Each structure stands twice: as structure tokens, then as C-alpha cells.
Amino acid sequence: FMLLISFIDIYFNIMNIKSSKELVKEANETIKIMSPKQVKSSYDKGEVTLIDIRDIRELWKEGTIENAIHIPRGMLEFWLDPQSSYYQEKKIGNIKNIVLFCALGLRSALATKALKEMGFDNVANAEGGFDSLKKAGFKVIHKEKK
């Protein structure tokens, strides 16, 4: 077992492969992060649009924030790109300020960085994700399977 661990360590070092933990850390150093309190305050004032990037099965199991737009992580860049054949103008509308969330804020950190790299300067990550937003007082609704 220790030999396997050593092999994996050597492989990652030789290949210069970054861990997901490193990627999230780097993303968090370059993106805007909003506390659940900040998100709730901005949301209550109508200043932000929440985008839930979790997998649909997570929404079926745990629900989502009321009025959040669901865009699966794998489609985010495509649905928000007006030049993409997948662009979702009707679903997206005229969004001014975007706050992304996932379960814990890790996937949404990477997604926030990706949108920032696309040129969105009005995007932030909800610190702590869905779990923290629930605790901050957001209304959770259940998503029905289609």
C-alpha cells in the first residue's frame, strides 16, 4: 500500500499535476468571495442573481435556493457565452451580478474563476456553498424530477 502511495506521489510530481485542492486555493486567491450574510443582504435588495451549479441529482435530493437559476457546472461557460450554440438567453436574461454556489463552495470557486477568465467582472462565489446559504436564511425549495 505504501508503495502505491509513493508511486502516486512520484507520478503527480513528475507530471506536474495539480490537485483539486490546489486549484481551488488558487481560484480563491483571484476571485470575489461573498459571505452568506453578504449574499443574503444583496439578494434581498435584488442586487444579485444566484446560480446553482450543482448536478441535477443534488437538487432532487437536497433542494435549491428559491429563484436560483440552475446551470449544471459542465454547461456553465457554454450557456453564458452568447457566441455558443448552447447560449441560454431566455434562461439567463439580463443578469447584472452573479453569485455562484455549489454544495460547499469548491466547484463554484473554480466556476467563478472560469467566468472571470471569460470576461465576467460581476461574478462572485458564495462562501460555504448551499449548506451555508441555507443557514443564512435562504428559502429552500424542492426540485421535482422530470
Model-predicted segments: where are they?
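Rhodanese-like catalytic fold shared by cysteine-dependent sulfurtransferases
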Residues: F12-V48, I56-N97, L106-K146
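Active-site flanking residues adjacent to catalytic metal/cofactor-binding acidic residues
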Residues: I51
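Short, surface-exposed ligand- or partner-binding patches at beta-edge/loop junctions that are enriched
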Residues: F101
